[in-house]
């Protein structure tokens, strides 16, 4: 086996080992982020195959997915116990921030639809 392949295998093993120690609530947020990004990619593939006639709808869908993923990543950063920057922030406050920002994002998206 080439050295680069061995290094890649060691890297993947160390990442899997580190991720196994991640708390369940952070893994759920990660799953939500992956779902939002995959949904955005599916919309882009659909637009490439079928077309983008109602372009506002396409943009709204993709921006909603990407915006939601970004907000979820920010929420993950805030609720991570290992992050010293947000140690004084209560998890309930972080979730309230996430919900409020999501509401504003989706109101803007709905306004963009017309």
UniProtKB/Swiss-Prot annotation:
Subunit of the oligosaccharyl transferase (OST) complex that catalyzes the initial transfer of a defined glycan (Glc(3)Man(9)GlcNAc(2) in eukaryotes) from the lipid carrier dolichol-pyrophosphate to an asparagine residue within an Asn-X-Ser/Thr consensus motif in nascent polypeptide chains, the first step in protein N-glycosylation. N-glycosylation occurs cotranslationally and the complex associates with the Sec61 complex at the channel-forming translocon complex that mediates protein translocation across the endoplasmic reticulum (ER). All subunits are required for a maximal enzyme activity. The gene is DAD1. Pathway: Protein modification; protein glycosylation. Belongs to the DAD/OST2 family. The keyword Membrane applies. Keywords: Apoptosis, Endoplasmic reticulum, Membrane, Transmembrane, Transmembrane helix. The keyword Cell inner membrane does not apply. InterPro entries: DAD/Ost2 (IPR003038). This is Dolichyl-diphosphooligosaccharide--protein glycosyltransferase subunit DAD1. GO terms for cellular component: oligosaccharyltransferase complex. It is a multi-pass membrane protein.
């Amino acid at each position: 086996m080439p050295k680069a392949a061995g290094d890649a295998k060691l890297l993947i093993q160390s990442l899997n080992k580190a991720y196994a120690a991640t708390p369940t609530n952070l893994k759920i947020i990660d799953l939500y982020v992956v779902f939002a990004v995959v949904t955005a990619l599916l919309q882009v593939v659909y637009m490439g195959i079928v077309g983008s006639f109602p372009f506002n709808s396409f943009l709204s869908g993709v921006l909603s997915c990407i915006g939601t993923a970004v907000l979820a990543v920010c929420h993950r950063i805030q609720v991570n116990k290992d992050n010293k920057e947000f140690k004084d922030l209560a998890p309930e406050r972080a979730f309230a921030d996430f919900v409020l920002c999501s509401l504003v994002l989706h109101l803007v998206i709905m306004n963009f639809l017309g």
